[in-house]
Amino acid sequence: MKKNTDSEMDQRLGYKFLVPDPKAGVFYRPLHFQYVSYSNFILHRLHEILTVKRPLLSFKNNTERIMIEISNVKVTPPDYSPIIASIKGKSYDALATFTVNIFKEVMTKEGISITKISSYEGKDSHLIKIPLLIGYGNKNPLDTAKYLVPNVIGGVFINKQSVEKVGINLVEKITTWPKFRVVKPNSFTFSFSSVSPPNVLPTRYRHYKISLDISQLEASNISSTKTFITVNIVLLSQYLSRVSLEFIRRSLSYDMPPEVVYLVNAIIDSAKRITESITDFNIDTYINDLVEAEHIKQKSQLTINEFKYEMLHNFLPHMNYTPDQLKGFYMISLLRKFLYCIYHTSRYPDRDSMVCHRILTYGKYFETLAHDELENYIGNIRNDIMNNHKNRGTYAVNIHVLTTPGLNHAFSSLLSGKFKKSDGSYRTHPHYSWMQNISIPRSVGFYPDQVKISKMFSVRKYHPSQYLYFCSSDVPERGPQVGLVSQLSVLSSITNILTSEYLDLEKKICEYIRSYYKDDISYFETGFPITIENALVASLNPNMICDFVTDFRRRKRMGFFGNLEVGITLVRDHMNEIRINIGAGRLVRPFLVVDNGELMMDVCPELESRLDDMTFSDIQKEFPHVIEMVDIEQFTFSNVCESVQKFRMMSKDERKQYDLCDFPAEFRDGYVASSLVGINHNSGPRAILGCAQAKQAISCLSSDIRNKIDNGIHLMYPERPIVISKALETSKIAANCFGQHVTIALMSYKGINQEDGIIIKKQFIQRGGLDIVTAKKHQVEIPLENFNNKERDRSNAYSKLESNGLVRLNAFLESGDAIARNISSRTLEDDFARDNQISFDVSEKYTDMYKSRVERVQVELTDKVKVRVLTMKERRPILGDKFTTRTSQKGTVAYIADETELPYDENGITPDVIINSTSIFSRKTISMLIEVILTAAYSAKPYNNKGENRPVCFPSSNETSIDTYMQFAKQCYEHSNPKLSDEELSDKIFCEKILYDPETDKPYASKVFFGPIYYLRLRHLTQDKATVRCRGKKTKLIRQANEGRKRGGGIKFGEMERDCLIAHGAANTITEVLKDSEEDYQDVYVCENCGDIAAQIKGINTCLRCSKLNLSPLLTKIDTTHVSKVFLTQMNARGVKVKLDFERRPPSFYKPLDKVDLKPSFLV
């Protein structure tokens, strides 16, 4: 196949982003943003949050203050590696320590005198234990000198049970665009949040709502609960900006449709009516009166001046150091969007759009928790000082309060899946698929309670804003997470930025904006507002917007601002705004740059010749105008061409309309979808099902399972796939393997492999084909006295235990064997008994159906004995186990056939697996056939012309025609055997072979599709799911089999099962199942008068209803099932009377039988 052509340049550039980039510090691209996020927290942000100096209490008009100072923050890495942590059964944590000083400041004439109250130098080894993120190669951000393990990609935490934890990224609730809502007809709200910049600690949040009712325009107010006054939005804008109402009218009306202009005039007129209704109206007096009224309403302890300063100074925290005039112009720009959105709602980003949201990564989780717990810690110290002063008259702090910051509990809860009282942020890694290490940390989800609480959310639909940045295939197909969790595409990442970098970047952008002529950036009446993270900094001349944005983008790409991930969005469509985004949590990905109708990739002739020796960062430095990092907001408001091929087919005038061009379709998939093959050649649902099944595939070891007491299922003899995509290779999924190559035949086999049934060869299983090992953790807690008790009677359950009460190493556990000794004893109060001690076994038993070998035993002795046992079991495929291809052709083992029973080809080769051929037609998985063809072609020519082994690149999504792959296969066969005839060549290309019947040794009439394919074994194993049993425990209430395979449960015999047996006429079987056992048999006395079940009072059966009416009941004994009696009792308790009536039949009389003469016929 021809390589390095112009048409493949975009593909090669995309591949450069996927591979490691050591010059930029990128060693593993899929999880690099998570590593950076956590590294920023542990190295920088934690120091910023914990370093505090602020007043706790103030007295005597601030002349006396109790101060707290936290300093000397130090973070120490662990002395051991993650593997040692697993061996010891410990967590992998960093230790954070700090010094707390509490002192009293008194302002005197001589100056400020300081009196020490309390101090604590935190050197405790358990003060703050921060779970440490394990990065690529077992490295951590605190100690980069740790040794590398190439196949360990990390991205996990290890908790105190040495269990790996990974988490998804949650969509932040706060939106960067105001949320528009229709409350009722002609009534609307526009709510927005304002959050202080990252350099302002503690972080301040304010939430505001603008309300507008067409019938009451005078009440077009802005409000915020307890943090701001309720005031007319137009008058507030006038008060802050110090402009006239006519100025605001012209600003709101500029470049607006006529219907919006009409509404603008009505709102301004309504504001005028307010001013005219007040004699000698003064805007300052009007606002001051409202502030005073709010002061009285809240019963604030502050003076009126302090209250006013606090309210107005903290108005819009994200513009904390901005003059009030710019805040007023910002409010005018918000009102402008609001009025436009009323008439053109569909053109405004809705609240479900990813344009409006930032994303919480690992570092942000810990940052938020550290911030919240620090405020709780300081609050506890303040309360303790106040209580001590009230009770003892001294300013003192209990040492217990100083030594319990509370962060450990918060971090522990985070790793247990609880973040801000919402589930779903973290979960235990299941270990049955190596891809989970990548897919879970790269998934983005909404808060579950966001959807439950808000009825307006429609996040369950695939939102248009997710296009290109999220994988459209790797989404949950069923369950509560449908539409709530999405997987990032391979080119997507999430931005991170340090506080110092944020401030420097903001300063450079402001300097660049102010380098323009002053009048051109002061068009506050009719210009385009320029905002940096929603903070208004200027308003640009409308005639300069295109030149400004173009020049800004060029300077950004050239590194003028020192950050290549800055987002600049030109919002047109009458909303008129230039938005510059520099914060963390934004979705970004690279795009090819189009400048003045030219694809910049095409105007760089040196790029193609130098590309092989360059990294992605080299391309950004030496060819800065070829690729641009674009965030999702900039992408949404830009014109983007979907492919280079389509762009080149356009006319020159059409090309000038575009700003960016996308990479090929394979880069729109996520890493899990990239493990599939040719999903665009299959039907749509196969891609979604294929992603779900690929994540359920059992892969090779992701960690040292013998030293880690954790659950896991691992493939014993994995093979690297031959047909792969570039993303599969660079993410190391291919190198870590998740299947084996098997030889398949598409045919029917004696009618056994119907539907999803597959036939698997016995000798293939015996040779270790798709063999797995199951590691299972068994954990029990035993009271110390129970563990020390000795058994009085020998128990078979304790046959595998040592004398120390623990299970023996290398013992084979069977169902019913005890894990550890647990004997409960009780003393009988019987003076005549010789031995009044009784004991009984309450140990937890091994419950699996298969035997397992004890690999490791771990014991912790505290007030209880904590025993953790790791068992291992090799498990070969059996009937009922599930397998699949990478095209979602799932099959279940229906029959294990001996090699002598299977058809064979001319070389005597028999298929390892036989699959029903009709499944290809019904599921339309053409790419499965292509994979077999390419794998077979590789076997004919596994090396390229340089003698190097080369896998076959078959991306998950591609624009390559099937004929191209057929031509590739043809060249491979012609190279290895040029003397093939056309028919033989065609048979080899299309993998068609003549197979011979094993019974007659005659060839089949038609050729069979026969060839190798990469096959996966799924975690759905028969022995893990079987719950059928003959005897066992029953529930007390309904006396049916209890639930849960681990608890020895079975399948309940309910209505549907009963109906099935009735259909078969198996009356005796129903009676036997429901009645005949001793537990289910129930004698019931029924009153023939009223049909009630009789009650037993003091051993006498009586009908309560008839006895109250002084009637003489006639009770009849019937036998029924216990569950029937429970049902009747429950119905009666709910007020539903079920009457048991007896069938009244008249007596039957039969005529005498005819006499039968038994004499021999010859005597008659």
From Swiss-Prot:
GO terms of biological process kind: DNA-templated transcription
Family annotation (PROSITE patterns): RNA_POL_BETA
Family, as annotated: Belongs to the RNA polymerase beta chain family.
One MF term in the entry's GO annotations: DNA-directed RNA polymerase activity
EC number: 2.7.7.6
Function: Part of the DNA-dependent RNA polymerase which catalyzes the transcription of viral DNA into RNA using the four ribonucleoside triphosphates as substrates. Responsible for the transcription of early, intermediate and late genes. DNA-dependent RNA polymerase associates with the early transcription factor (ETF), itself composed of D6 and A7, thereby allowing the early genes transcription. Late transcription, and probably also intermediate transcription, require newly synthesized RNA polymerase.
UniProt catalytic activity: RNA(n) + a ribonucleoside 5'-triphosphate = RNA(n+1) + diphosphate
One Pfam family this sequence matches: rpo132
InterPro entries per UniProt: DNA-dir_RNA_pol_su2 (IPR015712), DNA-dir_RNAP_su2_dom (IPR007120), DNA-dir_RNAP_su2_hyb_sf (IPR037033), RNA_pol_132_poxvirus (IPR024390), RNA_pol_bsu_CS (IPR007121), RNA_pol_Rpb2_3 (IPR007645), RNA_pol_Rpb2_5 (IPR007647), RNA_pol_Rpb2_7 (IPR007641)
One Gene Ontology CC term in the entry: virion component
Domain of life: Viruses
Cell location: Virion
Name of this protein: DNA-directed RNA polymerase 132 kDa polypeptide
Keywords in alphabetical order: DNA-directed RNA polymerase, Metal-binding, Nucleotidyltransferase, Transcription, Transferase, Virion
Main location: virion
Subunit text: The DNA-dependent RNA polymerase used for intermediate and late genes expression consists of eight subunits (147) kDa, (133) kDa, (35) kDa, (30) kDa, (22) kDa, (19) kDa, (18) kDa and (7) kDa totalling more than 500 kDa in mass. The same holoenzyme, with the addition of the transcription-specificity factor RAP94, is used for early gene expression.
